[in-house]
Amino acid sequence: MSEPEYRGNSFTGSRHALGINAPELAQYQDEPAQMRRRGVGKSGYLKLRFAKREHRSILAEMERRVPSMVQKALYWDEEMPELPCVTMISTSGCILQGDRLATDVIVEAGACAHVTTQSATKVHMMNANYASQIQNFTVEEGGYLEFMPDPLIPHRNSRFITDTTINIHPTATAIYSEVLMSGRKYHHADERFGFDVYSSRVAAHVFLGKEQPAGKELFVEKYVLEPKSESLDAIGVMQSFDAFGNVILLTPKEHHERILARVPAHFDIKGGIASGATRLPNDCGLVFKALGIDSAGVKNEIRQFWKIAREEILGVTLPEKFLWR
């Protein structure tokens, strides 16, 4: 059975074809024996639209399809009381073979939003097919978005492909974070970098307006990890580290220099952490990367960068970190 293609700036269907023509997944096109790919409960979809209303922003529209869901927006950020904070939840508790997931997040003009996850995302062991995820973010004029999920943990023999597109107005700001773990390294000797494929693509375009095609391409970053074909422990890749953090900050050029001045390169092999920031093409923003021996160290580095970005762009800082995070 053929699968419909993803088209346009948002994903509103229940199925997508991401991964079918990906060379890195060519040998993983077989149908799962347990439940067919993109079946009931395996085609998750989540749409979140945030809008400005008087003194604060609100979650104005929400659409969900299992296993993806959210609950109501909360306002727990005391430094930004106008900021709606939404937690994405999976009713399945993990990502399984044959899963096809998609997310649309829209921040309308002048609105703000913070989106996170309830916990780390696990990509379970697979014996057929793969899992895929499409993410689309649109941030309109003067909008502000923070997308700060917890780490993703690929289990042994798993295959996962993700494609992220950010459409952003030149006056808007978006901070997009992702943290990838080496696997469940304390669970089994073969779990550390035991996954088959992890493929990630992130691209950004200028937002031209609603119902308009995507504007100028600002940058594209893609990497494909196949640790069973090529070791990730090499110098210049992961070396001895087990956690990788990647943060994309898209914001007007006027903020870049001040942020970079406060984010020096950091390399401490004994302390198990390395991080640094640089500019993205087309003066569209900055990219910050961190390596660590565990998720805690990488998350701390990301939080510090996030804090600096907020202070320089909005003039407000982060609230105290929750004890359970």
UniProtKB/Swiss-Prot annotation:
Main localization, broad class: cytoplasm
Domain of life: Bacteria
Cystine residue pairs: none
GO cellular component: cytoplasm
MF GO annotations: nickel cation binding
Stretches assigned to coiled coil: none
Keywords: Chaperone, Cytoplasm, Nickel insertion
Task performed by this protein: Required for maturation of urease via the functional incorporation of the urease nickel metallocenter. Expression of the urease operon increases the likelihood of bacterial survival by contributing to acid resistance in vitro and in vivo in BALB/c mice. Y.enterocolitica enters the body via an oral path and must survive the acidic stomach before being able to colonize the intestinal mucosa.
HAMAP family: UreD
Complex formation: UreD, UreF and UreG form a complex that acts as a GTP-hydrolysis-dependent molecular chaperone, activating the urease apoprotein by helping to assemble the nickel containing metallocenter of UreC. The UreE protein probably delivers the nickel.
Family: Belongs to the UreD family.
Descriptive protein name: Urease accessory protein UreD
Organism: Yersinia enterocolitica
